[in-house]
Design a protein with these regions (language model features):
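Solvent-exposed, polar/charged alpha-helical surfaces in well-ordered, non-transmembrane soluble domains
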Residues: 18, 22-25, 29, 54-58, ...
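Subtilisin-like peptidase catalytic core
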Residues: 1-44, 89, 107-115, 168-176, ...
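Structured lumen-facing ectodomains of secretory-pathway proteins
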Residues: 63-66, 70-291, 305
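Zinc-dependent metallohydrolase catalytic domains
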Residues: 285-289, 356-376
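Structural recognition of the beta-strand scaffold that forms the well-ordered cores
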Residues: 2-6, 28, 33-38, 60, ...
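Subtilisin-like serine protease catalytic core
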Residues: 1-16, 30-33, 61, 76-78, ...
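Sec/Tat-exported extracytoplasmic proteins
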Residues: 31, 36-39, 43, 60-63, ...
Length: 376
């Protein structure tokens, strides 16, 4: 059975240490076999605060395997704002693995992209050739925005689809002054300004939806928590390659057409089987090698708030898969070798690491163990 420990409030972006400690204590008292921690803070150490470290050690002594997300910060030098006390590009130590996954008694889990994606999306409307299905990542739905698939039932769709306009630049307000986005879908490139600002600028320009083109081949979960209260535009992301397709079809006038699909499609991910770009690099400041393992965390279709389903990416999606594998291995050790408690727990991590498959880059070279740990 699952023990669900709620540590985040309805309107909180973080959890207090006291609440986390209470949840860990409850999990130990209730006899959990595995504890999954899909949370963390960038740039952790192998030992944390006394109370937190002691709680993790108590779990280990009780024979509980603890898995935690390695973090989604790439490295300490990527997107590093001033005043955050993180390393600079001149610092050799670029590790950003999150606490508590950095703790000695915790398995730190990196993220690998799913090979297949169940995605909603739209079809292009080329002047010649077959329409191409383009999948989208609908991050907006989890921030109170309308789902992209709601466009499939509107009048424009019944009349043959929607027009989209390629917004120059990165979607600043002055970029929108150079195009007519009124009643159209705004196609905007990622970069420089927040996703919420791009969406608000499109809303102000009269756009009916926003498609953000990533600057990489994969999807990321866009943070739209800062958009205006009255802005509920559908806001989705597509890959860099698909963005280039739409730009080419738009031609010199920057206008194109698309048809939103009401049916979800299973499509092969362009970056499937590769380490997720956001997955945090190790190791730790004391030269401990982290993360320990990698699991599928990129483009995972699962449950969301409000009884909905959707696709999300993050090491928080990878850690539960490793936790599930740990639970199955504990069961195997118990049923086959009558091994339980701390003895069984101590076998789980080395068994998983020694049987993991190294993940290869697109050129056939293995990713660094500082990125993938022992492998998938």
């Amino acid at each position: 059975q699952l023990l669900v420990m709620k540590v985040f409030g309805a309107s909180q972006d973080s959890a207090s240490e006291a609440v986390l400690l209470a949840a860990l204590e409850d999990a130990i008292l209730l006899g959990a076999d595995v504890i999954n921690l899909s949370l963390g803070m960038a740039v952790g150490f192998s030992s944390g605060g006394y109370a937190y470290t002691q709680a993790i050690e108590n779990a280990a002594e009780a024979g509980i395997v603890v898995c935690a997300a390695a973090g989604n910060d790439t490295s300490s030098t990527v997107g590093n704002a001033g005043g955050t006390d993180l390393g600079t590009t001149s610092n050799i130590d670029i590790g950003a693995v999150s606490d508590p996954s950095s703790l000695t008694q915790v398995m730190s889990i990196a993220s690998v992209n799913n090979n297949w994606v169940l995605a909603q999306g739209f079809f292009t409307s080329p002047s010649d050739g077959e329409p191409l299905f383009i999948p989208v990542s609908d991050s907006g739905a989890q921030f109170g925005h309308q789902s992209f698939e709601t466009l499939a039932g509107r009048d424009n769709e019944e009349k043959g689809g929607y027009e989209y306009v390629v917004v120059p630049g990165v979607g600043r307000s002055e970029d929108f002054s150079r195009v007519d986005a009124m009643g159209r879908i705004a196609l905007i490139w990622r970069g420089d300004i927040a996703f919420s600002e791009k969406c608000d600028n499109a809303f102000a320009a009269g756009a009916i939806a926003v498609i953000v083109c990533n600057t990489e081949s994969e999807f990321v979960t866009m943070d739209l928590s800062g958009t205006q209260v009255d802005n509920s535009l559908p806001c989705v992301m597509i890959s860099q390659e698909d963005g280039q397709v739409l730009v080419e079809e738009a031609g010199e006038d920057g206008m194109g057409a698309l048809t939103v699909s009401a049916q979800w499609q299973t499509v092969q991910a362009e970056d499937g089987g590769q380490l997720s770009s956001f997955s945090s690099w190790g190791g730790l400041p004391d030269l401990t090698l982290k993360p320990d393992l990698a699991a599928v965390g990129g483009n995972v279709y699962s449950t969301m708030d409000g009884g909905a389903y959707g696709t999300m990416s993050g090491t928080s999606m990878a850690a539960p898969q490793a936790s599930g594998m740990a639970a199955l291995l504990l069961q195997h050790l118990r049923e086959t070798y009558e091994m339980t408690g701390p003895e069984a727990r101590e076998r789980v991590q080395p068994l998983l690491m020694n049987t993991a498959a190294p993940v290869l880059q697109s050129d056939g070279v293995e990713y660094s163990p500082r990125k993938q740990g022992a492998g998938l």
